[in-house]
Amino acid sequence: THTACLSYEVLTGPPDRREQRARRLPEVSVINRENIAWLISFWGDDWPYDMVAVDEMSSFKSPTKRNKPTKKVIEDRTNEIVRALPRGLSSAEIEQKVTRELKKVRGELTRFGALCTVRKFISRFIGLTGTPAPNGLLDIWSQYYLLDQGRRLGTSFAGYRTRYFDGDYMGYKYTLKGGAFEKIVHQIEDITVSMRTEDFTDMPPLVYNTIKVRLPKKVMEQYKKFEKTMLLEEHDIEAVNAGVLTGKLLQLANGSVYDEEGQPIEIHDLKLDALERVIEEAAGAPVLVAYSYQFDLEKLRKRFKNAEVVGEAKNVVKRWNNGEVPILLAHPQSAGHGLNLQYGGCITVWYGLCWSLEYYQQLNKRLHRPGQTSTVFVHHIVAEGTADERVMRVLPEKNATQSALIDATAWVAET
């Protein structure tokens, strides 16, 4: 290929191996996202790379530069502060000084924050993603900041949000102002190229299907009461707020609910039964199954003894692509980016649904990608009358803005 003449190193493995390979300064250094902060810390102001290309750029969509300090960091720093205080202080004085010092404690840099510290040393920055705005155009600010250091969309996320969005009275939900979409596209179109796979490759069809399951009357009554009162009395489970309630309702739709101690309470097996029918109808064809919760995984492995899990064995992807894995279980968050699974099967089943459009689309594309020769089927097992149906409504709504952005910046091949 055209890159065969270049020298390269893969900066993975133990820190000493990474350091040794990094010091060789090949023409191309390849690193995973998890080690970016390490690489930046290693080089500091001696950063040697004048060009950076980031695959799956949307994984840098969070505009937060630092994570919140962990509980352990806070506890350790509190102990250090108290030990350093002079004797004889009152409890109120100690509390005041500790509070003041803790305000200075900062969490670790995020991926975005880490790259920001060395961006000034980079003359060319390229980002690639198939999901640039999975939750709307608020997602793109940090990605474009890394590309142009704020020249097009501004140097602060708050400023970008104020210029182009209107917030609700609580500041939780933001919607585009009139004409804002066109203004944003105008700002970024000179450095943005969108290419749809179907415009450049002959891809087989992608077919979406919904498989509905109906909860038994007693379970549905429990669900509705839980939804209304935020209390599942039969199992002494309480949802402390609307966000927790939504998660608990999705758990119940899947078949179990975590109690206050984090132990799963089994409610039903309807989704397992529906999945079993899909696998039987597949007549031996491999099936990729997306699950949501740990109890999902445990129930799936108990029901399907021949199932294997992405990430548990180093060669599981290779064996899947060789047709040696009949059922592959994957969590969307860990299997959504970068995996090539198109050679092993053409059936995906969403056993547990997810709110993230990015994870949803990325996992669907594990099978429907160049190299696939068969029609790809994506089945969704949906419990009727539950939060599952809400997820199925929300995902297309999220995709509308992203598709409009891709269309507005699309480059179509000449025919």
Label every model-predicted segment.
Residues T1-P15, Q149-G150:
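Conserved helix-turn-beta segment of the N-terminal RecA-like "Helicase ATP-binding" lobe
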Residues N32, K61, L297, A307-V394, ...:
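Conserved RecA-like P-loop NTPase helicase motor core
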Residues S59-E80, A92, Q96-C116, L357:
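Substrate-gripping "pore-loop 1 plus following alpha2 helix"
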Residues T1-T3, P134-D139, Y293:
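Conserved Walker A/P-loop ATP-binding site and its immediately adjacent core
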